[in-house]
Amino acid sequence: MKKSFANYLSVLVEDLFFSPEDQVYWSPEHAGLNGQKLPTLSDEGTVLRLTKPNIEAKGSVIYFHDGSKNLTAHIPETAWLCELGLEVYLFDILESEDDKGFPIESYIRKTGKLVDRILQEIPQEQKVLFSGNFIGAYGALENVSKASEQAAGLILHNCPYSFRSYMLANYGPGLGQAMSALLASDYQDPYVLVSEIKNVPIVVTYQNTGRLPISEFNKFRKTELPNLSYIEFPAKAPAQTVNKEAEELRERIIKFFDTRTTS
């Protein structure tokens, strides 16, 4: 009964976390970057490595975006990382008609396989930053432990504090509670995963886009963990706007690859 209801609700939940589409928005060349597709198994997805020509790699970034089939839409928002001398790995998971349950289940499973593939490409001596947006932040949380001593830092942008609180904030006590119970009963909440990470600096960032209530961000801000810090971006500022918050994040990332200590 639970599974059949879950399959029904998955149609409603799909748009909460994912915006699948096949449109090509940007090419690496548009951003002045080199792009290389990594070979993967046919049922896993697509991995694209972005690099800045003639710049020696100082580290790598695995970027978990919040959709599927729209990898190229995220090239402009990650290109600045390449300017810092970082190799950026973007990926799309491959959806299948055979996928069952809620979208998050197949997302986590397939994301794990692609992260394994990406880590095979990164030299053991090179540091890796995990960065995720919305449900991509959960993917980053689930996979950062795979990098072990390579993990330089973790950035969680517009990350739900818990599945239940996110659903309740958006849908009220009735439907929200039912959906949260079915959606993520087999997964730990983001705040639980954050509390288990001890030796990796974490930056939780937030910008009000109407998708995630600020109450989720404020709950993280009340969390007293020594490796946790926060940046709130102005609500109306475009994604590529250079402001003091963006400069602060840039400096944090540079420090991630200089030292393992937090500010």
Where is each model-derived feature located?
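An N-terminal hydrophobic leader/cap segment in hydrolases
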Residues: 1-41, 46, 50
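The serine-hydrolase catalytic nucleophile loop
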Residues: 67-80
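Conserved alpha/beta-hydrolase
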Residues: 82-98
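Alpha/beta-hydrolase active-site loop
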Residues: 101-121
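Alpha/beta-hydrolase fold nucleophile elbow
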Residues: 123-134
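Active-site nucleophile loop of the alpha/beta-hydrolase fold
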Residues: 155-165
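The feature captures the conserved acid-bearing segment of alpha/beta-hydrolase catalytic domains
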Residues: 179-222
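C-terminal catalytic histidine-bearing segment of alpha/beta-hydrolase fold enzymes
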Residues: 226-263
